[in-house]
Amino acid sequence: MSSDNNNDPFDLNEDGHDYFNRVSTTTSPNRQSINSSPKQSSPKSTNNNDDKNNIILDLNDNNNDNNNTNNYNDEDIDVDNKNKFENKDNTYNSNGGSNNKNKNKKKDNKSNNSSDNEEADENTSLISDSEPLLNKKEKDDEQIEIENLDGEDYDDEVSLQDFSSMIVSIIIPVSITMMAVVFFVKYLNNQTLYASTLSYTIAGGSSGGGSGADSITGNSFVDSLIVAGIVLGMIIVTTVAFVLLYKYRCLKILYGWLFLSVGMMLGSFGTTFFQAMLSAANLPLDYITFAFLIFNFTVCGIIGVFWYAHQYVNQLYLVIISVLMAISLTRLPQWTIFTLLVIVAIYDLFAVLCPRGPLKVLVELSQERNENIPALVYETGKGSDSNLKLGLGDFIFYSLLISRAALVHMSCVFSTFIAILTGLFLTLLCLAIFKKALPALPISIFLGILFYYLSNNFLTPFIEALTLSQIFV
């Protein structure tokens, strides 16, 4: 029995599963001693042995099946991984993959293939596959270059198309300013109060600002030169001081100066203007309410010009400042006004076009620093490509010239108005051609003075003669 126990198949199976030990550990020691006692073989024991053998065979078969299924699964996983890697390699090669993977593939092909002809065929096939990719890339690059060229041409076309809108955007505020000045000058010139406000500059002349022949300073060319020289000297000094402050970055002083100047213009000139308008319209108003309105008007103007405000509010206050300044300068004598306009137009040429002119230096400094100039400048569109800037002095002197024409005859007003707009259009055309800062005063002022002279000496007498003769054209 000992030999039978040694050859007992319940000891270990082929896969190392100790089935017999697991069975024996569940039995008690008494059971083990009983089994270890010698007994005769019986058919039941043989049947039990057969059952045990069948169980062992079934377990072995199950283990073999599990191993086979595991092997099949591993082979499937390997095949799937290979397919994935091959797909990745194919996609990588189709998109212009790295040369290292291609080299490894070539080495594997060379090691597997025995003939040199097959290697040559593979190399030629790789070259033939890579050539269309290069041709496609070259074609794509050519298409991109053509599209870029088309884009540049399109930008140029758009800039030319926007030129008309740019002209309209700057002509509209200039026209509004001039028409407002003409309206208020004509309205206030018919009132006796406005004539009394001009008495401090006119001695014995008419209420139109020295157009009569008896005025002391109006017909004196020397006196007009002196007054115009004083005004021009003030303009030069303030411009040079402005450039120096901006050059040395004294921005706090510069903004304080601008705040004070705008407050003075809106406060003093606004007070005089509104008093004249209230008196002309015969509207009573107490001093407290008037002071409150002027204070709010001035503070809102400073905030609207230099602080955060809507673009239309900013533009509105710039137009109001131009109107107030032009109306206040209209009280100067006739010869003084024309002398001042000519001298300022010539100075504008020097200041903008001269290599060391103050305005040219100011523009160059702002371009170098990529900063906006803190000045009273009218902008058509902030932050846009079609942004035009026109100084507030240009608005003032345009309006001053047409206000002087309004004191003579309406025919002078229309002719001067058309001349000023024509000069402004020519200036903007030169700006589009030369693409640099240009003076806006010379062409418009000289054309305006020329048309004013022709209208005053030829057109106005002709219209008056036709009116007296009752001939209407």
Curated annotation (Swiss-Prot):
InterPro entries: Peptidase_A22A (IPR001108), Preselin/SPP (IPR006639), Presenilin_C (IPR042524). Its EC number is 3.4.23.-. SMART domains: PSN (SM00730). Residues 1-164, 246-252, 308, 356-389, 435-442, 464-473 are cytoplasmic. It is found in: Endoplasmic reticulum membrane; Golgi apparatus membrane. One of its GO terms (cellular component) is Golgi membrane. Residues 22-46 have a biased composition (Polar residues). This is Presenilin-B. It comes from Dictyostelium discoideum (Social amoeba). The lineage of its organism: Eukaryota, Amoebozoa, Evosea, Eumycetozoa, Dictyostelia. The gene is psenB.
